[in-house]
């Protein structure tokens, strides 16, 4: 029953909802985003970090914030998602190879979610991963970018502060993760 599994199991299940670490596009994006997140955390004043450490409800997140502020764990984290990401890209490429315009043929929440995922790839300098040997995903992404909702709901959200932060991040960001992803795509396609 409920109590025989222990509260730790229940807590773990509530947080992960049964999804393994970096196993889906939705769980891989935070892994790929860790260098950007660390860049943003390091830009915070120490007092903000202390507020997070004192007030954040999740201890695991507190530890991540502290590690990113005082250390440099994000250099290796993105590589943990490369293989699963490439597998997900290949699945999408096969799905869109039937000529459909959207995930379910008509624009849906899945397309909105993928729009957000692909836009995050742009933010991270990884957009090439959805066009390298994947013409069907590339065509789909171009359709998504041409929608007014992309401009109004995503691009118009960025303020000058976000644009400046991303520009600074790009200056310090190496392309080793991009290279690793493209190499895996080359191997698997």
Segments from the language model and where they lie:
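Short, thiol/selenol-centered motifs that function as redox-active sites or metal-ligating centers
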Residues: 8-10, 111-112, 147
